[in-house]
Amino acid sequence: MSALSYFFAAYCIGWVISHSILVFKKLSEVST
């Protein structure tokens, strides 16, 4: 596995985590 694909995988994982956190915050704001 090359360094570039390694970086790309880490970037995708970080993007998904950050967006899921944002969605979770919005959902918790709406529910309250």
From Swiss-Prot:
Subcellular localization(s) per the UniProt record: Virion; Host membrane
Membrane topology, as annotated, equals: Single-pass membrane protein
| A cellular-component GO term for this protein | host cell membrane
State whether keyword Zinc applies. no
Q: Which residues form the signal peptide?
A: none
Does the UniProt entry include the keyword Membrane?
yes
- What superkingdom does the record give? Viruses
- Transmembrane stretches in the record are 4-24
Keywords linked to the UniProt accession: Host membrane, Membrane, Transmembrane, Transmembrane helix, Virion
Family stated for the protein in its record? Belongs to the inovirus G9P protein family.
* Protein purpose: May initiate with G7P the virion concomitant assembly-budding process, by interacting with the packaging signal of the viral genome. The assembly-budding takes place at the host inner membrane. In turn, G7P and G9P are present at the end of the filamentous virion that emerges first from the bacterial host.
Its protein name is Tail virion protein G9P
Please name the source species.
Answer: Escherichia phage If1
